[in-house]
């Protein structure tokens, strides 16, 4: 699965796509594995692998974009948080930690926090007790020093996620797009449009400044309607990609992986029709 993810990432990035991976499923360092290595190397080497793939696949100097995330409950989350502190490491990816309410409560109360793997198991194979406050302070320090990791308040995201009511149909949110604007399920894609709030201010920088809410509401409706058309346009482009793959000179064995990848993306786009209409320029109002 780890190698398949890398291959799919490369295939997407060669078409100028960005990718978000959640690494919570990877065994923590030292865990037993059923191969000649005997134990797992943990998260960090795979962070490097995906980062290197991102830097290597470029078009005219423009490389792909990558988001790597992990749950704070994962025993290797501290190593994940520290991974970019060494200069030159994981330079091809943004990294973000998925923070739970339980962890934040432990931070506030200065209590120990139990990490485990698998993170959602009632019978984990690995457990580890840590100081929640110390790890939180490390997150804050590293973000101050190197601008990463980002923080995803995951329980809040899931509580406010409408698509997760269809989690049993394949729409369970697992990570975000590379810039973190929209949490998504596997093989879905981000389609984003922002409304400039400053443009709705009437008589700006005066005592009579006010926000044109009626115009904003009208444009929000139009924006959502436009984004619905964008989904159809995207599926047309995916059809073109699928047609090109069919006519590529490589043998079917080579082409099949990319072809099936785009089939999965098209299916998810058609079923979910996800859009991201947001706002910008709030600070300029």
What are the roles of these predicted feature ranges?
Residues 264, 271-285:
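Extended, well-ordered alpha-helical scaffold/bundle regions in very large, multi-domain proteins
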Residues 245-248, 254:
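Internal transmembrane alpha-helices of multipass membrane proteins
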Residues 1-219, 223, 232-246, 261-268:
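Active-site cavity-forming subdomains of large catalytic enzyme subunits
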Residues 230, 252-258:
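Extended glycan-interaction surfaces of carbohydrate-active proteins
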């Amino acid at each position: 699965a780890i190698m398949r993810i890398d291959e799919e990432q490369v295939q997407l990035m060669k078409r100028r796509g960005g990718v978000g991976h959640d690494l919570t499923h990877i065994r923590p360092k030292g865990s037993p594995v059923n191969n000649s290595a005997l134990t797992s190397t943990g998260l960090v080497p795979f962070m490097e692998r995906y980062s290197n793939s991102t830097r290597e696949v470029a078009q005219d100097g423009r490389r792909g974009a990558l988001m790597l995330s992990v749950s704070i409950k994962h025993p290797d989350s501290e190593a994940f948080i520290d991974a970019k502190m060494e200069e030159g490491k994981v330079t091809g990816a943004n990294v973000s930690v998925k923070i739970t309410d339980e962890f934040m409560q432990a931070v506030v109360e200065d209590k120990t926090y139990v990490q485990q793997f698998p993170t959602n198991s009632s019978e984990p194979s690995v457990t580890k007790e840590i100081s929640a406050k110390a790890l939180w302070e490390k997150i804050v320090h590293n973000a101050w020093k190197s601008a990463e990791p980002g923080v995803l308040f995951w329980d809040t995201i899931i509580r406010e996620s409408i698509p997760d009511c269809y989690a049993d149909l394949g729409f369970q949110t697992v990570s975000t797009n590379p810039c973190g604007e929209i949490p998504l399920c596997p093989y879905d894609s981000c389609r984003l449009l922002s409304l400039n709030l400053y443009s709705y201010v009437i008589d700006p920088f005066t005592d009579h400044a006010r926000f044109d809410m009626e115009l904003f509401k009208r444009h929000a409706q139009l924006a959502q309607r436009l984004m619905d058309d964008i989904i159809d346009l995207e599926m047309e482009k995916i059809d073109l990609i699928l047609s090109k793959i069919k006519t590529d000179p490589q043998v079917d064995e080579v082409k099949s992986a990319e072809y099936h990848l785009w089939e999965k993306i098209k299916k998810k786009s058609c079923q979910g029709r996800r859009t991201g209409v947001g706002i910008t320029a709030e600070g300029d109002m």
